[in-house]
């Protein structure tokens, strides 16, 4: 159907830019959508968690020299997503998992936050980007990537990435956990077919070839993400004119609360932020038999999500700074690990409803971790992918959206609260805190920090 739209628009006597705009307008009109609510947000059902309809988008933009013209994008390699049998039998190498955990927590203190002090990103998505870059590079550039990740060989990284992908992959109405990748090449760029096929098999990446002109590349990638991220928000793709090569990696996550929040228990309270102190709405519930940890530096607990994943909430102790925890990757990893295995008890949660979008430059994160030659046009080595010279990584940006709210109505007979005859602890997130979504095998899927809370619009 998409090709029909393209052909119809191409027959009209318009400039390429106007053709692209008309094509997208036709697609928006012709493509069926799920029913949105009055605010344009998607409804996933009463018991669906809208803790995070999260989408993390990573882009690697590589400098260009020349551009040729071809009509539309052509697929080069296409992945086949894991079957139920493949996910059921998937295994991940322990050394790779240990390296990924260390890498993930080390990034937390290196990510720049927005003007409001808040941020959310996917270290897992970052790791897939690194694996893709490693396969496309060689020499010193590849060595820097492997060293930053803590592995010795490309095979360890690519095979580990592939194994974990199959282990984590789920795509059902109740639970979505999927990383999506694509590689976009300008029509003038030479390429190694075997490398692109390896990206399809190991990182499950699509690859396309098209002219990077008249905004077509940015529009094509935006369309691709709209179709593959399963997210109701439009994802804007930055594009620098003159680029030859673009790597795009995103992470889509949707889950359910294991024990639901109900709207009747939501209340208004004060959040004391670093720059804003004011009222906001708090979700509230009591959960029975959940891990609870108290240390000199932080209090932490978790809320179970479907699919075996967990939302870990970490509140620094009074007088302690959030940066003290985030800037110490080993400390953050220790708190998460101890929380996951802490003694279980009853905990009352008060969690502010937050919603924000962030775009961060993760090239600076990689630079702080020792990956520098990929961004230096005199040293970058992308010879594994292309025989062209002068190719280097110009920019890496990651965009993410976060919604944290109950968004659930209590059904008759449905469990809403836990109860206990023993002692009960509380975790009131009324000042800056951080959160981590971890998979069943304790891989950090998303990391975020909340320093200031703005009231959600009703």
Language model features: what each stretch is:
Residues 316-343:
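Internal alpha/beta scaffold segment
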Residues 3, 50-56, 65-211:
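Detector for small/aliphatic-rich hydrophobic stretches
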Residues 41-52:
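N-terminal export and membrane-targeting signals
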């Amino acid at each position: 159907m998409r090709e029909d739209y393209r052909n119809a628009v191409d027959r009209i006597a318009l400039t390429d830019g106007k053709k692209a705009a008309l094509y997208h307008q036709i697609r928006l009109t012709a493509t069926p959508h799920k029913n949105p609510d009055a605010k344009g947000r998607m409804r996933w059902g009463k018991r669906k968690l809208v803790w995070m309809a999260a989408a993390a988008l990573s882009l690697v933009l590589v400098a260009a020299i020349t551009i040729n013209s071809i009509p539309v994008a052509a697929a080069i390699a296409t992945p086949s997503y894991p079957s139920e049998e493949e996910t059921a039998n998937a295994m991940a190498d322990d050394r790779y998992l240990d390296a990924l955990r260390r890498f993930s927590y080390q990034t937390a203190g290196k990510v720049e936050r927005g003007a409001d002090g808040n941020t959310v990103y996917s270290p897992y998505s970052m790791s897939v980007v690194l694996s893709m870059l490693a396969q496309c590079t060689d020499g010193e550039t590849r060595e820097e990537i492997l060293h930053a990740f803590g592995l010795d060989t490309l095979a360890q990284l690519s095979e580990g990435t592939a194994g974990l992908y199959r282990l984590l992959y789920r795509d059902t109405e109740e639970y979505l956990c999927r990383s999506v990748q694509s590689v976009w090449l300008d029509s003038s760029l030479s390429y190694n077919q075997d490398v692109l096929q390896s990206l399809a098999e190991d990182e499950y990446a699509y690859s396309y070839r098209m002219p990077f002109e008249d905004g077509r590349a940015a529009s094509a990638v935006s369309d691709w993400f709209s179709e593959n991220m399963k997210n109701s928000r439009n994802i804007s793709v930055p594009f620098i004119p003159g680029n030859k090569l673009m790597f795009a990696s995103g992470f889509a996550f949707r889950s359910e609360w294991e024990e639901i929040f109900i709207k009747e228990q939501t209340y208004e309270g004060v959040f004391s932020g670093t720059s804003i102190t004011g009222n906001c709405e708090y979700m509230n519930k009591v959960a029975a038999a959940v891990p609870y940890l108290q240390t000199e530096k932080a209090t932490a607990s978790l809320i179970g999500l479907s699919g075996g994943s967990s939302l870990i909430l970490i509140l620094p102790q009074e007088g302690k700074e959030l940066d003290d925890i985030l800037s110490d990757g080993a400390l953050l990893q220790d708190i998460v690990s101890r929380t996951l295995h802490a003694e279980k008890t009853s905990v009352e949660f008060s969690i502010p409803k937050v919603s924000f979008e962030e775009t961060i430059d993760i090239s600076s994160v990689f630079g702080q971790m020792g990956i520098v030659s990929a961004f230096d046009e005199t040293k970058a080595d992308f010879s594994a992918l292309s025989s062209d010279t002068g190719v280097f990584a110009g920019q890496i940006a990651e965009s993410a959206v976060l919604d944290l709210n109950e968004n659930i109505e209590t059904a008759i007979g449905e469990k809403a609260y836990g109860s206990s005859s023993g002692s009960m602890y509380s975790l009131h997130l009324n000042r800056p805190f951080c959160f981590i979504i971890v998979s069943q095998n304790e891989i950090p899927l998303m990391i975020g920090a909340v320093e200031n809370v703005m009231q959600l619009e009703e």
